[in-house]
From Swiss-Prot:
A divalent metal cation 7 binds at C49, C54, C58, C59. Residues 1-28 are annotated as: Beta. This is Metallothionein. A divalent metal cation 1 binds at C4, C6, C20, C23. SUPFAM superfamilies: Metallothionein (SSF57868). A divalent metal cation 2 binds at C6, C12, C14, C25. Pfam families: Metallothio (PF00131). Residues 29-60 are annotated as: Alpha. InterPro entries: Metalthion_dom_sf, Metalthion_dom_sf_vert, Metalthion_vert, Metalthion_vert_metal_BS. The gene is mt.
Amino acid sequence: MDPCECSKTGTCNCGGSCTCTNCSCTTCKKSCCSCCPSGCTKCASGCVCKGKTCDTSCCQ
């Protein structure tokens, strides 16, 4: 069971211990959710994701 309600609320502000596996949120901590593609250097830990593509608009 996903400990976070990312897919329900659209937001995820989890701590480092969170293990979201089905996150479809638009604003979340990269350290918790996989909003951005794995290996995306522009989405550093703690960054707030804005999309699912690895580009300049990926995070804010």
